[in-house]
Amino acid sequence: MSLRSGLFSLFGLVANVVAADLDDFVTRQRDIALVSALNNIGPHGSMVQGAGAGIVVASPSKSDPDYFYTWTRDAALTMKMVVDEFILGNKDLQVYIEDYYHSQAIIQTVTNPSGSLLASGRGLGEAKYLVDGSRFNGAWGRPQRDGPALRAITLITYSHWLIQNGQESKVKDVIWPIIANDLSYVGQYWNSTGFDLWEEVSGSSFFTTQSQYRSLVEGNTLAQSLGVKCTACELAPDVLCFLQTFWNGEYFTANINTQTQRSGKDANVILGSISVFDIAASCDDPSIQPCHSKSLANFKILVDAFRNATLYPVNDGIPINKGVALGRYTEDVYFGGNPWYLITIGAAEFLYDAVAQWKSQGQIKVDSTSQPFFADLYPKVKGGTYQKAANLSDDYNSILSTVTAYADSFVAVAQQYIPKNGSMSEQFNKAPPGNPISASDLTWSYAAFVTMSERRAGLYPPSWTTSTKLPATCITSSKTGTYVPAIAAGAPNVTGSCSVPVSFLVNATTYYGENVYLVGNVAELGSWNVGNGQQMSASNYTSKRPLWNVDVELPGGQNVSYVYVRKQNCDQGYIYETTNRTLTVPACGTTQSLATNDAWEGPTGSSGSC
């Protein structure tokens, strides 16, 4: 044997050992991730005592940060993983799915700071709830419009399995009403701005729009199979047309129609593409699949942005054809702006998805948009179409192998920074040794690992795409939704009382660390209990106008009494206004809006010495 051939044999042996080690890690960690995700689901989850049945808790962490809530988005994505695992053969998971849709039927009816179910449906845009399913009154980025779409997708996937197994009546009578509410919300509000999946940017989000499109397409398919009408689903082409406008010529800008100034390079887009992945979709499908040329170009630009060792020291010295630790966006400062497990793992899933689609189609198309992505991994690549061939040494198979190895390298990054016990927090430190930080045992992190491992093993969710023709011109359509409590699924029979949005504005000069709350005589204002009152926002506070504000949905036509309350720092307690205020909420069915223009009346406090 020559020295050269001997070296090649040695390198091949090392590569096989590394691959086997990664295989063992994925197998072991996948089992840990699934169990850990289930441990965060009520009522029996070992990490979330007190959570209601079917409630998916974001994390057991109750401080620094407090994630002991249920987010509609996180819950839907987690349960989509659970539904997929169930369909793939784990029948023990059905009880979690049944509990989930019962809990969501109830949550849909909970009046909250975003609104109520009746008659406008605005309450469906609320981001999070307490773990018993009750409303969260704190200041937050509201509304968030991805939740209803993602929940609909999850329940539609389960519904198709039920229909295939002879339970169409259950779907039509019990589950469809939940889905119909969410689809109505999507159809009515898809073209309205809201907060993105990171809960920071108010505008139009790529991730949200992509999920909304999928929900309407799948909703239409399910409605047809049930013989029911989905009026909102008719808007799918308009949503799809709008999705194309996020492309800026180089990459997808994650958020548009926003005042927030960022580059727009954001993991939002990668996560969006894997959430709409369909192995049967073509790579030029306008739903923007992982194998789409623009998706691949966007992937390279985002990943390259995080190769900066000054930004992420853990990525120092990693070559261009290897995976790196990824965060949300390069301007991130939350908890120091670190890599996220679910995003780094999501990058691997994205690549496994693309490889699966190329294999399904038997070809790989390389154009001027995607060529830089391929060139990093396979330098001899040229523009054109690479066809599947019997010769294993051809370019088609070589590209598949290199992209698969690239995907594995992102998994290897996660392997390096996941503790030996398999626990997965939200983030890991951008500086060596890359220790876990932020919320512990993040449910979404675990769900992301399971879905990645499914794709790596060649296990794929059911197909959903249909042929949708892009309109010649994008239009800003909307259809007013019809909302009905899903009583057969366990929802309370809430009736016709409507709610009307009221903007509370008060000028109150405060010191750093002091907050202002709104309390009043109705449940939406805490029924005079400041602990359940509305925390106000100082986002528009200036020295010239010390404005605190909050938007609240109140019962239409009622007289409401309210006051403002200062919450002092250093456990100094509360200071109440010395005046009682009243207002009359506009009647139901009117287009009249109401905003107060108040000024604080009463004593003020001073900062404590803590």
Predicted regions and their residues:
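Aromatic-rich carbohydrate-binding modules that target alpha-glucans
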Residues: 508-559, 567-586
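Structured interaction patches on ligand/partner-binding surfaces of diverse proteins
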Residues: 568-610
